[in-house]
Amino acid sequence: MFGLAVLTVSTSGSQGKRDDSSGQAIKDLLEGDDFQVVRYEIISDDKDTISGKLAEWADADDVDLIVTTGGTGLGRHDVTPEACLAVLDKEVPGMAEAMRAKTLEFTPMAMISRSVTGIRGNTLIITLPGSTKGVRECLDVVMPVIPHALELLHRETVSEHPR
């Protein structure tokens, strides 16, 4: 069982002015056989606050996967990708590229997604759009590889690759 942390980036949500349907969607889609939610928070669209929370959670022993929602667009306050990049040890660009490629089949707006994916220590961090629809579509793409990616992060060798 892997520890899951869900971080919703929304100033209005952090002030209680907006329901967090996208964060709830992440929990609903991932919690179960492979994942247990160990952290959940709604924070404002502030780069330092986001970076600090990502680093804190990634460095915790019980967090294997952090999934964020919100702040990946082109808006003036959308700084989640920059905050994430500031704390990553390595990017995993293929996951973000796959999410964009697949969601482009549903909407041309996928071209302006700035989602990033990477690792800090042994923790995988995935940034998702703020919409519930975007969360579902993107997670559908990467869910099949997340457990294997986490296994790779937690041991030196993996003898079998999933097909």
Question: Language-model segments: which ranges?
Answer:
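Non-catalytic beta/alpha edge segments that cap or flank active sites
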Residues: 1-163
